[in-house]
Amino acid sequence: SPLKRCTQTCKILYPEQNPLVIANLSECNFGEWEGKTANDLNEDEDFQKWLAGDPSVKPPRGESNADFTRRICKMFESIVEGLIKTGTTESVIVTHGGVIMTLLAVYGMPQAKPFEWVMDNGFGYSVRITPQLWQRDKIMEVFSVIPEKKDIED
């Protein structure tokens, strides 16, 4: 994501790398809801529908859940296909929680709803993509939270 919180995090975690910044892995465009809390929007009927997962509702001047999911999935599939084609076996994506939760809900095994993949800032997941499984079923194995809690406590 080109947003500062992602580019700065990437520089801290991987100072020797020259990351490729991909705009289509940005967080959902919340339009006029950006910067407002759920409490601020509590009386907004569209916000309540959006929060309940209605894919047709979008924030004013923003992006619907369906459009957001379509955008990030198209980009993610392109990235995975490129990694498989080049034989790349390790890669990192530094992006936002909403992007991570949505991608894992769409492609992750075990299957879970987006909110079940929530994590604290600075955390993520390690996944394994097996080319044959990906090409057949478009799924990936989610196998650990990173960094592990013990890494932080040391």
What does each model-found stretch correspond to?
Residues 69, 73-84, 104:
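Generic structural signal for well-ordered alpha-helical scaffold segments
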Residues 98-101, 109:
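Short Gly/Pro-enriched loop/turn and capping motifs at secondary-structure junctions
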Residues 1, 70, 94-95:
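Short beta-strand scaffold positions
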Residues 87-97:
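Generic beta-sheet signal
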Residues 1-46:
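Phosphate-coordination/substrate-recognition cap region in phosphate-metabolizing enzymes
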Residues 28-39, 81-89, 105-154:
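Acidic, low-complexity terminal tails and accessory targeting/binding regions
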Residues 12, 102-106:
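Active-site signature of alpha/beta-hydrolase-fold catalytic machinery across serine-
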Residues 48-67:
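Short glycine/proline- and acidic residue-enriched helix-loop micro-motifs
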